[in-house]
């Protein structure tokens, strides 16, 4: 796990508690390659969070139990990074071209004897 993953996840949970998860998420991802833990409060200010509530949530570790549960579940499923996808229980790891998804979905439809959509059938299941 990336060393900043837990602080970033806890900050996102703290932002969610104030109804600004997506704003905070977008700020984190816009600065992902270079952000530092001390910038988490700065980002909270920038997206309009109550910084005292935000800091209290971080200091109290309120998000940690749910984050740890999510991490345990992903580890049990064999997920080692992002992005990760499951299509009808089949694991697909990493950023993939659309065709990889289409092939897996069509293979699952065929395995379950579900007719392919007309466009997929016309392309031979691709």
What are these model-predicted stretches?
Residues 39-126:
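C-terminal cap of thioredoxin/glutaredoxin-like
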Residues 1-44:
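Structural microenvironment flanking redox-active thiols in thiol-disulfide oxidoreductases
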């Amino acid at each position: 796990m990336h060393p900043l993953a837990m602080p970033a996840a806890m900050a996102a949970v703290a932002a969610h508690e104030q109804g600004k998860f997506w704003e905070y998420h977008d700020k984190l991802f816009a600065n992902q390659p270079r952000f530092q833990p001390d910038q988490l409060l700065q980002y909270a200010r920038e997206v309009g969070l109550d910084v005292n509530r935000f800091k209290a949530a971080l200091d109290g570790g309120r998000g940690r139990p749910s984050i740890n549960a999510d991490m345990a579940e992903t580890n049990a499923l064999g997920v080692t990074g992002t992005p990760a996808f499951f299509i009808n229980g089949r694991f697909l790891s990493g950023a993939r071209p659309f065709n990889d998804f289409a092939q897996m979905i069509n293979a699952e439809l065929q395995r379950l004897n579900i007719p392919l959509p007309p466009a997929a059938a016309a392309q031979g299941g691709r």
